């Protein structure tokens, strides 16, 4: 093959997998290969598949298969393929960016007719299939990675290399030469049959271990998401057909034994599933009957096929393929964002910001990886979700590397273990072509990367331990904990801030606060990109309009406090405002974001505000999911945010996006966000701040025209400055600046 990068046609066969298909196509957009087209063959789908395909428009070749038959669908794809190489990947799978480069390299040998890679299962961390050798009864025999399959590539071989359909490629000339796929294989053994016929035709079938695909095991009409069969009929037909066609001619008795062995094996599996409660008796009976009827029909079809040697491509290949249609790859950078928390399990400020940044960068064509912690008790996974690679990791505090990081950086064990696991995963991502990695200053999650020359690393600035310390009296109340945990973290933070070459700040205030608290001027090394947040009205337009009308009609004024029940968030001030609200007959106040636990109740009692706990116009909703929080924003009139420090104030812009005037303190970055011309009001921290806020609520309750005006100002300010699109564009420019600076130094 003259061209070292031959044109490749990637065929995706889909049937009622609309929920996964879009991610499969977005995964292909992340490939690093100069010339490939994508062909999507949609079966008789009744879900959203057609709509997903339509959204991709002319970037793909979209075809239709009227039968729920994988081999027919594959042949339709082959008939449309204009590339020299035809690759297959499932509609619930995503490739490594180097997938095509690895596969096509083997085709420089003109004897090679097929190449397949290694496939990772739905955990994202364990193998589904690596090298597999099959016999002429369709039985798979796993072999070691070091097994040399090349000697098996001879016509008539009892054993031959077989590829997995979700990670397989073929020389178009070879695949068409054997007639493509046999339509009898509606499901199972379709690619095994093709590999056998290629070998018998004199072609070589090879494995390429570095051609990786992640297979997510989506449910189908054949199996559930837990890989429990819904029906065994199509696979039993394929097995009966394969054994009879390829096994019987050489050994009739052996073929009979293979059929009986397969029958017994699956009947035993069905019995085990029934005994464990995985399936009920009716399901078991149906599967047993599917198996028996399928094997019988497969044998009958094989005998009826007689001396047929090729596939059925000619039945669907009525005309030459359309011209090659290059697929547009994502041209952006490959960026890793580190956040130990990740929504919905953790929706704190950094986790939420990381998610919004990731989604915004992805929408602008960048390839984004999230390195986050697996939830307690869960195993590690890697998955591709809505265009994002999500790496859910488990730190190991007992590892020797963790101890080394504790000694080197003075980190507490918990933080060191996480930083070590992040560093390991980042090294794995080097094979993806990682351009940049970002970690937050809080907890120093990616600290070792800062000193690793293999990575371009940036630090995002948020509240540091040192900045939080004045609002955490419990830190000083436990001297031993402060000595072991907080003092080392503050020292490590200061060391990082002193040498981090690139810092992403969310406000000028955080740069000033760090200079004041840590004694380090970051201005020459930091770029400010303000936070952004999505529009909550997109799915709540009717609710927003209903609230506007209620506001105009003097319905009770709804005030919303969102935040943890702690001093830094001004929970104590909000409690005292709630006590004042009791005397305002047309005002309600709701608390979201914190648990009304013993500590919160004790604080309320100390403030003499126990009456709010049972008052009908004061509500404690606890920690809520994002959708419920956005519902609360849209259903409120005013946001109360009396924080004593915020590096930016994400809650403020979330409220403004919903059209809420924000009442806050003159603290941190809040005066830059909550301005008079943004519909907000800033209150000086002092002994009468509660009375001032209460007076403001009285005024807004009375003057609904003023309230409406300020609601419009808040919404307009969000649209102009704090959208996710604006944030993503700013961070994109920041990353470009960082990489240009790094390239200049190189």
Protein language model features and the residues they cover:
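A conserved acidic beta->alpha catalytic loop
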Residues: 27, 42-51, 93, 535, ...
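Conserved donor NDP-sugar-binding/catalytic core segment of glycosyltransferases
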Residues: 98-133
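Acceptor-binding helix/loop patch of EC 2.4 sugar-transfer enzymes
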Residues: 400-409, 453-491, 536
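N-proximal low-complexity "stem/linker" segments adjacent to membrane-targeting elements
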Residues: 1-27, 327-329
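Glycosyltransferase donor-sugar binding loop
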Residues: 533, 588-606, 622
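Non-catalytic, C-terminal membrane-associated alpha-helical segments of glycosyltransferases
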Residues: 251-331
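Aromatic "clamp/platform" in nucleotide-sugar-dependent glycosyltransferases that forms part
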Residues: 66, 644
């Amino acid at each position: 093959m003259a061209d070292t990068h031959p044109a490749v046609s990637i065929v995706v066969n889909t049937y009622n997998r609309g929920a996964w298909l879009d991610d499969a196509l977005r995964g292909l957009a992340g490939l690093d290969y100069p010339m490939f087209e994508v062909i999507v063959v949609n079966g008789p789908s009744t879900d959203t598949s057609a709509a997903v395909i339509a959204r991709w428009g002319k970037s793909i070749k979209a075809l239709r298969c009227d039968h729920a038959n994988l081999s027919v669908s594959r042949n339709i794809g082959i008939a449309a393929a204009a590339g020299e190489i035809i690759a297959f990947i499932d509609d619930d799978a995503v490739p490594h960016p180097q997938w095509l480069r690895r596969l096509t390299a083997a085709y420089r040998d003109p004897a090679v007719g097929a190449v397949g890679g290694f496939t990772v299962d739905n955990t994202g961390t364990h193998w589904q299939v690596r090298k597999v050798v099959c016999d002429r009864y369709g039985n798979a025999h796993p072999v070691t990675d070091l097994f040399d399959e090349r000697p098996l590539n001879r016509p008539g071989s009892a054993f031959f290399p077989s590829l997995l359909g979700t990670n397989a490629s073929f020389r178009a000339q070879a695949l068409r030469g054997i007639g493509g796929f046999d339509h009898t294989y509606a499901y199972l053994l379709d690619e095994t049959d093709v590999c056998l016929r290629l070998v018998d035709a004199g072609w070589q079938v090879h494995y390429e271990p570095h051609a990786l695909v992640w297979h997510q095991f989506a449910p189908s009409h054949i199996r559930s998401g837990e890989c429990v069969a819904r029906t065994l009929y199509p696979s039993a037909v394929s097995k009966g057909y394969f054994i009879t066609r390829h096994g019987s001619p050489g050994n009739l008795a052996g073929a009979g034994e293979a059929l009986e062995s397969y029958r017994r094996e699956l009947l035993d599996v069905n019995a085990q599933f029934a005994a464990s409660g995985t399936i009920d008796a009716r399901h078991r009976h149906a599967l047993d009957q599917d198996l028996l009827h399928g094997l019988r029909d497969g044998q009958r079809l094989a005998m009826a096929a007689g001396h047929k040697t090729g596939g059925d491509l000619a039945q669907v290949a009525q005309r030459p393929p359309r011209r090659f249609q290059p697929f547009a790859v994502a041209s952006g950078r490959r960026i890793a964002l580190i956040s130990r928390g990740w929504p919905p399990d953790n929706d704190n400020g950094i986790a939420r910001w990381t998610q919004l940044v990731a989604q915004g960068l992805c929408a602008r064509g960048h390839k984004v990886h999230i390195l986050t912690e697996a939830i307690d008790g869960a195993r590690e996974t890697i998955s591709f979700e809505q265009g994002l690679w999500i790496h859910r990791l488990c730190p190991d505090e007992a590892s020797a590397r963790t101890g080394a990081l504790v000694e080197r950086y003075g980190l507490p064990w918990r933080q060191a273990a996480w930083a070590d696991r992040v560093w390991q995963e980042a090294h794995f991502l080097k094979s993806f072509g990682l351009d940049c990695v970002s970690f937050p200053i809080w907890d120093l999650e990616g600290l070792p990367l800062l000193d690793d020359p293999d990575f371009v690393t940036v630090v995002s600035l948020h509240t540091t331990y040192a900045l939080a310390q004045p609002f955490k009296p419990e830190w000083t109340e436990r001297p031993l904990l402060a000595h072991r945990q907080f003092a080392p973290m503050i020292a490590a933070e200061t060391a990082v801030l002193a040498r981090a070459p690139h810092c992403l700040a969310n406000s000028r205030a955080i740069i000033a606060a760090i200079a004041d608290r840590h004694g380090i001027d970051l201005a020459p090394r930091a770029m400010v990109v303000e936070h952004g947040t999505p529009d909550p009205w997109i799915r709540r337009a009717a609710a927003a309009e209903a609230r506007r009308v209620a506001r105009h009609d003097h319905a009770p004024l709804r005030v919303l406090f969102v935040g943890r029940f702690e001093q830094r968030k001004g929970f104590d001030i909000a409690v005292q405002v709630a006590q004042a609200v009791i005397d305002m007959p047309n005002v309600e106040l709701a608390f979201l974001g914190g648990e009304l636990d013993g500590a919160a109740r004790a604080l309320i009692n100390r403030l003499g505000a126990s009456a709010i706990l049972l008052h009908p116009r004061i509500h404690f909703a606890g920690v809520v999911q994002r959708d419920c929080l956005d519902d609360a924003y849209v259903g409120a009139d005013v946001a109360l945010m009396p924080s004593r420090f915020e590096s930016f104030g994400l809650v403020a812009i979330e409220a403004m996006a919903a059209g809420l005037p924000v009442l806050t303190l003159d603290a941190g970055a809040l005066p830059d966000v909550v301005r008079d011309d943004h519909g907000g009001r800033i209150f000086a921290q002092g002994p009468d701040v509660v009375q001032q806020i209460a007076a403001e609520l009285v005024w807004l309750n009375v003057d609904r025209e003023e309230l409406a005006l300020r609601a419009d100002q808040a919404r307009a300010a969000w649209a102009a400055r704090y959208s996710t699109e604006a944030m993503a564009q700013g961070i994109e420019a920041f990353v470009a600046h960082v990489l240009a600076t790094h390239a200049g130094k190189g």
